[in-house]
Structures are given as C-alpha cells and as structure tokens.
C-alpha cells in the first residue's frame, strides 16, 4: 500500500486528482499577475511610449498602470523619458480643434530622402511612411481659444488670446499622460509665453510696464501665480547678456514694432527687446538652446544674442529638403533639441478638396561660431487634411 502511494506521488497523482486538472483549476482562480506591481512598473517604464497604445489593450490593469503618475515618475528616475510632438489643427465646420501626435515606428532606421541614387528595393520600402500624425482622443472639452501653448514637462498650458478676459479665467492645461484638460489657478494679467525650469514667465500689459501686473510668474509645481517685483525688472538692451531670448506678440502701434522679452529665471530678471516689424512668421517660430528659428520667404532664419549683440543668419545645408510653395503654411517646433518643420503641399484653388501635411526632422550644428548648419534626418507625408485647414500649434511634451 505504501509503495502504491509513493508511485502515485511520483507520477503526480494525489488524492485521485490528475495534475493537469489541478493546474487548470489553479489558472482559473488566479486573476492577478504573477509579478509584483513594482516590477511591472519598472518593466513598462523601460518600454518606449510608442508601444503604450497596443499594451493598453492587454488588460484593464495594464491600462491603469500605463496612465498612472507613478509610471511617468519611474520613467523620469530611470532616464527613459521621450519627447513627443503634439500638433493641433482646426478643420472647417468643426467647433473644436483636433489634436495629433507624431508617431514614429520604434527603433526604425531613419528614412534618407537626401540621397539621389537609391536602390529599387529601398525605394519600395520608402513608399510606406513610417512617420505619421496619429489622432488623439481628448476626453473632455477644449478651451475656446488661446494665443500660445506652453509646454512644461508633460503639460501643455493654453494661454488666453484675450488679455481682457485672462485675469478672470483659469488657465487650462492638457495633461499629455491622460489626454485630459484640467485647469490651473487664474492669473492676474498676462497672456504671452515661455517657460524655463518649471517656471512660466508671462509678460503682461505693455501699456503699464511699471505695474505689478506687468509680469506674472507661474510655478508649475505649487500651481501659484505671483508678480515679478519691480526691482527685478530691467528693460535695457545692454542687460541681456546670458539671458534667454524668446518671442512674444505685443505690438507697439506707434512704431510698428514687435516686442520680445529676455529673462533670467533664477533671478526673476527681465529685459525688453525691439524686433523687426511684426509678421505672421514670428508666430510659427520656435526656440532651441536660446536661439530663435523661423521661416520666411523660402529661408530658415536663426536669431540670437552674442554677448550684448543681436546676431542672425540663414541655416546652411538642408540638403534634400524640398522647396516650399509661397502659399504653404509652415510651422516650426523644437523636438528634443532638433528642429521639426511642418508644411503643406500647395494645391490649386479648384479641383482639390484635400492637401497633404509633410514633416521633416532637422539636426542642427554650430560651425565657426557664426554659422548654423542643418542636416535633414528624414521627411515624410504625415497626414491628409481638408484644403482649408489651419495649424494652431506644434510643441513637444516630455513623457
């Protein structure tokens, strides 16, 4: 009898139950993953966010983890954050704008359109685009209008276009982790933009530069506003050394000039710069490492400060980048230290209902201290849009 029991145990039969039946019962009653939550969190944090859409389909628990603040904190601690380009477009006859993000096939070999002689096999591969603008489903309503979108980490702040209404309304911001709109506390008097080290600096009314309301400071961590003290403001061109230079859209109607602010965030110090006559190209410009880039009349222009002197020039190189039509809409954006260019291909007024948006990624290199060269890493057709669409903004978020 003892030998029979030992044989049954050795063969996996116990209490008359075959092992496969007990295994099936065990699987049916186990709903939790075998790995601890912290381990799953670390594993998912190391995965490119480009895969998150597909991973969210695995289970509700995965979907919950992929949108949790803990995941993005872990990605930051592990140094796994990525830059994602967000693009907002307005389509005709639609009340709310549409949001898109630049989707790039993970670990892809960059498409090289700059080489004139290519193999036939490579040409076939390039016919299917690996870069595209993928639509985003926003879970709640958009702000009606804004004059600027400010990117701070994984938040996109929508600054009001109406300075009269700005002090009386909260500041909406898009949480790029969950794609939901939230509201920051209302500001006192401010409506233009830039950000640095988690602090948003907003120049206010030009008519009263000595007012306490002239510059508002918003701390994104504490979600509080406060004015810059008068003694911390310096509106002199000679005081711009080692300060960050950026655009704004004030207009001095008397001189026909655009105004920009330069600031040093740690010391709450501001400076005022007079630019050329305000034009629409300023609205599509972007800042990369304290240098402003914009597109005007077929050229990519850069502008920055060399000590106390304002310097500028044309981006050299750019081999392979197609020429844009004079009627094309062009938008520039900073994307992980590189320049992203969005433009549309011109179509005649009649006979066409749609057009194509193209996108290029350009790496920048300073040479000889006075030149900036651009290398076109790739460009692709990324989205088909109605002919009368409008680009509202393009900016990168860190996730």
Swiss-Prot record:
Region (Disordered) location: 1-29
Superkingdom per UniProt: Eukaryota
SMART domains: FBOX
Residues covered by the F-box domain: 29-75
Compositional bias (Polar residues): 1-11
SUPFAM superfamilies to which the protein is assigned, alphabetical: F-box domain, Kelch motif
Record field: transmembrane: none
PANTHER family: F-BOX/KELCH-REPEAT PROTEIN SKIP4 (PTHR24414), GALACTOSE OXIDASE_KELCH REPEAT SUPERFAMILY PROTEIN (PTHR24414:SF184)
Protein's name in the database: F-box/kelch-repeat protein At5g48980
UniProt source species: Arabidopsis thaliana (Mouse-ear cress)
